[in-house]
């Protein structure tokens, strides 16, 4: 594309977006929600919250397509063409509109009984330095995530090391289930495995609580029908939705 063509496209894109939104509003008035809803989020959110929402949306709005881009990297959702994003509140820009998607949750340390039988069970945070901790590489910076824990009622950041590095919390959970090492995961993801006894919760007094996941989107004069449909279904589907 020539430079002139790129300038022309940049100039008409807002108008085209307005036309698409007007068409979507017209069909919504007829009781149909259509179009493509693009959401950027973390893979962990898909497993924590989005699956039941998507299942309900498919039944209620069969002409609405939802594209989920699961990525560790925090992107500019407007520049990248997303309708909305889902992240921890602290990662969201202040000029965005936010709506709570999940309740608060704890980030916990888990390991399998096989691993603990072979390596022992840590009793203190300092003991983690002697264990195989499954690392998480952050997408945007490439840095290794430092575990956020509570030590004697004060927040601490712990650097860990181990034989495995992943780019996704679900991968860390899978490795913990396989007996590879200790993983730092959201408690809702591990709940079933804790109940079954496949995993054990380590150092429970050190678990950090996060404020939950929030849907966010740019401020507009009015909310697009497809995004409104998503929010309405989320409210009815998730018990923790506020």
Positions of PLM-derived features:
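Alpha-helical "hinge/linker" immediately C-terminal to small N-terminal DNA-binding modules
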Residues: 1-31
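C-terminal effector-binding regulatory domain of bacterial HTH transcription factors
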Residues: 10, 59-63, 187-196, 205-242
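Short loop or secondary-structure boundary microenvironments that flank
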Residues: 12, 43, 162, 217-220
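All-alpha effector-binding/dimerization core of bacterial HTH-type transcriptional repressors
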Residues: 32-37, 41-43, 48-56, 107, ...
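Central regulatory/effector-binding core of bacterial HTH transcription factors
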Residues: 35-97
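Short, well-ordered beta-strand segments
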Residues: 36-40, 85, 134, 183, ...
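Residue-level signal for inorganic ion chemistry
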Residues: 39, 199, 230
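C-terminal regulatory
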Residues: 79-81, 91-213, 240-242
